[in-house]
Regions:
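Active-site neighborhoods and metal-handling regions in enzymes and metal-associated proteins
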Residues: 1-444
Length: 444
């Protein structure tokens, strides 16, 4: 992989301009950076910038606040950042400082974060509306409330606080739902890295290994391309494949079991999310293949519904119909297809939705409904498509040959002008393709 791809300054500037057009004059938006979080004692978690802050600024440091003031001269975009500090930079890394915030990150003006209590109330003064995501940063919420209350006490002096607080996250998250060309290119890269990692994991899967060994293969591929995990990988063999959010990843890989691997990477702040399920020994049993082919057919039917003009729930409806019909064919459900779908009988074995939005967050922002109606799919929206069937041992009325079969197949799909594009098609998906890849790896 070449040098880490990044969005250019103009991409961030375009987003800020778009947001300020939506806000209108006489308004102000306040967006804080993510706080540093402690793992234990004096050990910190690796710092990851707040997605909304990153989306608007591209500025990766903590203890920062972005302020947007449409129409303000001479500075519409103001950053509050940490001052340069040679001693702290020796310990913790370089800082941009106020000068760097302007020169490198496109701020119109920048101030030390230590001065925010003196400066920001003046920026709030006499604005009609303040756009802020109340509740997203509880500690910072208290400071915003204090600034507003302080202004209200000075109303007799002609200093007026904004009359209305508008939920910034609602506006900003609708913007984030539509990916630009530059964003989609990063998501293609994230998808390709994750696809390569899944192929590597398949090739290293053997009876006698362990789930954590598969995790290691995934992480190896992520890190060698300067990517990280977009969420904790789920690597569950046998009975663990039937646990949707299995976390331990520490059990042996057993001959005859299936292995469900749900793992994606984050590359330059954009996530991928892939799931594949395959036999530990490289060969599906007849029962495993029966169930696998139903899930694959459901996923392909769902992907076929990802196109402009269809509503968000269309892929799920398609997957539900295929899975319910398949469960009827296996004898795991009994009754008439329409009634079983209406009653949700399939939820015994397929209990989750078929997908979610994908972007800077793996479960990305954006409403699924507009009012009471499912949202209509439009070009630039990115979603996962991930139906599954899970049959834990001891399920009442289920033949033993299906016990502990947990299968999910997941890809990342972008809505295009004419249909859709699968961003993660670099991983084998049919049972025959999977067996061929694993056989070749075993023979190598």
């Amino acid at each position: 992989m070449a040098k880490l791809e990044r969005l250019n300054r103009e991409e961030f500037a375009r987003r800020r301009r778009q947001l300020m057009r939506i806000m209108g004059k006489g308004t102000i938006a306040i967006v804080p950076a993510a706080p540093v979080r402690h793992r234990n004692s004096d050990v910190e978690y690796p710092y990851r910038q707040d997605s909304d802050f990153q989306y608007l600024t591209g500025f990766g440091e903590p203890e920062s606040v972005a302020v947007l003031i449409p129409g303000r001269e001479p500075a519409e975009y103001v950053l509050f950042v940490r001052d340069r500090d040679p001693l702290r930079e020796t310990w913790d890394g370089r800082r941009a400082g106020p000068e760097g915030a302007v020169a490198q990150f496109g701020a119109d003006d920048a101030f030390p974060i230590s001065d925010i209590d003196e400066i920001l109330p003046g920026l709030l003064e006499n604005r009609e509306k303040v756009y802020y995501a109340m509740g997203s940063h509880p500690e910072f919420d208290q400071r915003v409330v204090a600034w507003l209350q302080g202004l209200r006490t000075q109303a007799r002096n002609g200093r007026h606080a904004p009359l209305e607080m508008v939920a910034l996250d609602h506006v900003l998250h609708d913007m984030r739902l539509y990916k630009s060309r530059a964003e989609l290119q990063l998501m293609r890269t994230a998808g390709q890295i994750a696809a390569d990692a899944h192929v590597r994991a398949m090739r290293h899967c053997r009876p006698g290994g362990h789930e954590y060994g598969i995790v290691a293969e995934l992480l190896h591929e992520f890190r060698r391309h300067n990517a990280d995990t977009s969420y904790q990988p789920i690597v569950g063999g046998g009975a663990n494949s039937c646990i949707l959010h299995y976390r331990e990843n520490d059990m042996p890989l057993v001959d005859g079991d299936l292995l469900l691997v749900d793992a994606g990477c984050e590359y330059s702040f954009y996530a991928s999310d892939i799931t594949r399920t395959y036999p530990v020994n490289g060969t599906f049993t007849p029962a495993q293949r029966e169930v696998y082919d139903i899930v694959l057919a459901a996923q392909l039917a769902a992907i076929a519904q990802v196109r402009p003009g269809n509503h968000w729930n269309a892929p799920h409806d398609a997957a539900v119909e295929v899975i319910t019909r398949g469960l009827l064919g296996l004898g795991l459900l009994k009754g008439k297809l329409p009634q079983l779908i209406k009653d949700g009988a399939y939820r015994r074995f397929f209990m989750h939705r078929t997908g979610h939005w994908l972007g800077m967050d793996v479960h990305d922002v954006g409403d699924y409904k507009v009012g009471d109606e499912w949202r209509v799919l439009e070009p630039g929206m990115v979603m996962t498509v991930e139906p599954g069937i899970y049959i834990p041992a001891g399920s009442k009325g289920v033949p033993k040959r299906y016990a502990n079969i947990g299968i999910r197949i997941e890809d990342d799909v972008v809505v295009t002008r004419t249909g859709c594009e699968v961003l993660t098609d670099g991983v084998p998906k049919t049972a025959d393709e999977i067996e061929a890849l694993m056989a070749a790896a075993a023979a190598a």
